[in-house]
């Protein structure tokens, strides 16, 4: 028996040697060069360096330098430890093929063993590289006894200064807020000082647009972050990409929950370097969709309609809503305020003032007018006041167990968690789930098609423990609860509209508000456009981005919003993705809220602009043109200039948030369009034709907006594209909504259109001859247009499935 065991052991050692390169106490670096990436483990410094390579294999840029990966854990005896790559005596590299949601590629694993603290643990860092992708992934794990626990793993942890970019005041680091509560803002900080961004960030040169994008693609367990200490507007002193963040901005009062061993692994982290950081952010969103596809269950078109909270708030009533519904049906919708399917949504918020019978009557009346009705819920909030009787019974299990408030509430440091005026409920608790299941079933039976879900971030605050004993982190608890709720809604095809909510996980909602509590003044428009300035790319995570209720004429100081402010707020909705206006249009309402006569007057001027409504019907968010020109010079200020490109038009929206005229010129090369690519430029609010010669001239009055539409030559593009001969390029469907494009000559750009000529995706190639495309949002026949380096182009038709 012993002889047979020895032979088996020898075979295992031989097979391992084929894949593993051991390094023990020596000064040789371990180098991985694969595609556009070069990863070097510098043995003498016990640290990683990551370089981006040019097509020929020469180093283009060092994007991460001197990264000493960090793991914090409790060992088998419960002693808190911290180890880095420098803590281990041995390191070995292994290589294996992988084939997962990102496609076929290679995984390079660095295993660190024999830590100086004497624990029987190993640390493993994996790098995943896929041909044709402009990014790689990396994660970090700590492995040992089943009793180990970890709540902090940093696959990237730079602790020494290096220059990422030449010093320039246009260089920026993007801050992404964890949620949309507390009037938090996106930020584009100059590269000097400390910044923390949640789940993703970009460090980029504003003027060249080159940028490094870092972030997490797994959102079922961890809260992750990117933090940096920067200097000289281009240098990195510290840079950490890690799982296990807990701050006041994540709404946590206690540390991140600890994940159980014997193997604890961070989220996979996206590392990508792009010629245009905006493309990088969009690519990051698409990468997330490969892991967890977004919810795309809504088939009734871009949401246009009315929202009850914005002006009426809690002084709503059945009679008022019926009158407003009639006004939409009789006046606004026939004149063009609706989506391209002719649909309208009436979203009834908290305090709608209706009984169940009135709800049924209202829904039935709306159905006759081709209007759908939405309702309101707060799935994880316990509205009990601050001093409830914790022994109150909320529900009873099938076995007779009674669930009290104390059983259901989340606790931190033994005390119930109070947030945003309510106590937070455990998303894993059977009562929380059953209450929402009953609510959804009942609302659907009434005829509601749309549910606004508010304060859902109450379910993602770290607690001491959860009803489900296997759950130890806030994100895992939230994911369990939201997955259950989403499955209930999918039974009935209902729209989930998240209001106050975290950005990640995203896959449970059809829409999410980009910024909350936004009314109608120019200051409110600027606040909302700040979220588009830094977060436009989130429309790839949600079927629609929501600009919040669009108020034209509101209450108090909002009664006197100027017509320019009205245009700006309305356009804010159109360049975001949804159009739920919230004015009080009822002439017979006696609540004292709003000014119905003025609202109807403004509606005729603003809400019936056919061209703006056609633009809004796309349901897409516009990109910032610059990315570093904040309107007021502050890091959290909105930008003025935004753009969106499809095959028929290029739209450029210019917002003026200030009390004086805004005028100037935008070079066409910044808009990615040449002078011979369009036949006219029209401003959509004044209907003025604009003369363009190398630059787009703009002039925007105080507190107003202008939208410039370039009409591209070639009409919609579909006919022209189908007539172009595809003779050099081969496009192969790979399944999984992926295409491989092979070419006999250098390609500069690939564009993918649907059969109606709508642009669905682009990829800049910089002279490559092959590229794999991921199209997570596309299904069906596609037209693929290839732009070659020599200026020619051609198209082929293919199936995406």
Residue positions per predicted region:
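C-terminal outer-membrane/trafficking sorting elements
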Residues: 2, 12, 719-801
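Acidic-aromatic substrate-binding/catalytic surfaces of carbohydrate-active enzymes
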Residues: 29-115
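Beta-strand-rich recognition/accessory modules
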Residues: 31-33, 194-300, 700
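Acidic, contiguous internal or C-terminal segments within carbohydrate-active enzymes
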Residues: 108-166
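Substrate-binding cleft of carbohydrate-active enzyme catalytic domains
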Residues: 301-463, 477, 484-490, 496
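Glycan-recognition surfaces
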Residues: 390-422, 426-430, 434, 480-591
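Carbohydrate-binding surface patches
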Residues: 573-576, 581, 628-673, 753-755, ...
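C-terminal beta-strand-rich structural cap/linker in extracellular carbohydrate-active enzymes
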Residues: 692-715
């Amino acid at each position: 028996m012993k002889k047979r065991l020895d032979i088996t052991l020898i075979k295992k050692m031989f097979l391992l040697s084929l894949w593993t390169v051991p390094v023990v106490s020596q000064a040789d670096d371990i180098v991985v060069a694969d595609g556009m990436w070069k990863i070097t483990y510098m043995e003498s410094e016990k640290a990683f360096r990551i370089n981006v390579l040019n097509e020929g294999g020469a180093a283009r840029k060092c994007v991460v330098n001197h990264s000493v990966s960090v793991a914090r854990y409790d060992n088998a005896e419960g002693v808190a430890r911290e180890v880095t790559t420098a803590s281990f005596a041995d390191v070995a590299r292994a290589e294996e093929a992988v084939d997962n949601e990102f496609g076929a590629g290679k995984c390079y694993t660095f295993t660190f063993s024999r830590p100086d603290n004497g624990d029987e643990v190993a640390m493993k860092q994996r790098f995943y590289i896929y041909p044709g992708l402009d990014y790689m992934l990396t994660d970090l794990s700590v492995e040992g006894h089943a009793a180990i626990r970890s709540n902090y793993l940093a696959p990237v942890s730079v602790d020494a200064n290096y220059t990422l970019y030449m010093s320039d005041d246009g260089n920026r680091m993007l801050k992404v807020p964890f949620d949309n509560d507390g009037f938090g803002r996106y930020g584009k900080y100059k590269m000097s000082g400390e910044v923390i961004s949640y789940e993703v960030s970009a460090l980029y040169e504003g003027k060249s647009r080159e940028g490094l994008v870092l972030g997490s693609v797994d959102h079922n367990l961890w809260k992750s972050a990117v933090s940096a200490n920067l200097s000289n507007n281009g240098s990195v002193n510290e840079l950490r990409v890690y799982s296990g963040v807990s701050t006041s901005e994540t709404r946590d009062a206690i540390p991140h929950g600890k994940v159980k061993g014997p193997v604890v692994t961070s989220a996979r982290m996206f590392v990508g370097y792009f010629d245009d950081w905006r493309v990088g952010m969009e690519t990051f969103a698409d990468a997330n969709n490969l892991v967890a596809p977004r919810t795309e269950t809504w088939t009734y078109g871009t949401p246009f309609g009315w929202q009850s909270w914005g002006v009426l708030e809690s002084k709503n009533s059945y009679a008022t809503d019926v009158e407003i519904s009639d006004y939409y049906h009789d006046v606004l919708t026939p004149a063009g305020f609706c989506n391209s399917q002719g649909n309208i949504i009436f979203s009834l918020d908290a305090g709608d003032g209706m009984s169940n019978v009135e709800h049924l009557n209202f829904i039935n009346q709306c159905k006759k007018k081709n209007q759908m009705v939405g309702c309101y819920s707060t799935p994880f909030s316990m509205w009990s006041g601050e001093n409830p009787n914790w022994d109150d019974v909320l529900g009873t299990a099938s076995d007779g167990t009674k669930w009290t408030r104390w059983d259901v509430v989340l606790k931190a440091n033994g005390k119930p968690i109070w947030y945003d005026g309510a106590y937070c409920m455990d998303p894993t608790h059977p009562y929380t789930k059953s209450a929402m299941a009953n609510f959804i079933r009942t609302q659907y039976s009434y005829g509601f098609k749309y549910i606004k879900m508010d304060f859902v971030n109450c379910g993602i605050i770290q607690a001491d423990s959860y009803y489900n004993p296997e759950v130890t982190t806030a994100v895992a608890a939230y994911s369990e609860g939201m997955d259950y709720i989403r499955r209930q809604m999918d039974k009935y095809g209902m729209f989930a509209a998240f209001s106050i909510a975290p950005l990640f996980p995203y896959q449970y909602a059809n829409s999410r508000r980009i910024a909350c509590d936004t009314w109608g003044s120019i200051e409110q428009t600027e606040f909302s456009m700040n979220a588009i300035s830094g977060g436009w790319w989130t429309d790839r995570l949600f079927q629609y981005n929501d600009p919040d209720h669009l108020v034209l004429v509101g209450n108090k100081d909002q009664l006197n919003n100027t017509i320019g402010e009205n245009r700006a707020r309305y356009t804010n909705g159109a360049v975001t993705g949804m159009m739920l206006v919230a004015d009080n249009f009822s002439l017979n309402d006696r609540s004292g809220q709003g000014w119905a006569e003025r609202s109807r007057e403004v509606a005729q001027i603003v809400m019936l602009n056919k061209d703006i409504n056609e633009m809004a019907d796309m349901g897409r968010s516009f990109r910032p043109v610059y990315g570093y020109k904040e309107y007021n010079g502050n890091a959290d200020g909105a930008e003025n200039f935004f753009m969106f490109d499809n095959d028929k038009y290029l739209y450029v929206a210019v917002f003026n948030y200030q009390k004086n005229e805004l005028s100037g010129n935008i070079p066409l090369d910044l808009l990615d369009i040449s002078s011979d690519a369009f036949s006219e430029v029209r401003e959509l609010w004044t209907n003025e034709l604009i003369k363009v010669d190398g630059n787009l001239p703009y002039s925007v009055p105080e507190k107003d907006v202008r939208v410039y539409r370039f009409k591209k030559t070639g009409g919609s593009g579909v006919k022209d594209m189908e007539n172009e001969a595809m003779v050099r390029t081969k496009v192969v469907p790979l399944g999984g909504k992926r295409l491989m494009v092979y070419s006999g000559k250098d390609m500069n750009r690939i564009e993918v259109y649907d059969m109606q000529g709508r642009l669905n995706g682009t990829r800049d190639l910089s002279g490559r001859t092959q590229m794999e495309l991921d199209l997570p949002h596309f299904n069906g026949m596609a037209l693929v247009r290839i732009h070659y380096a020599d200026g020619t182009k051609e198209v082929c038709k293919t199936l995406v499935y």
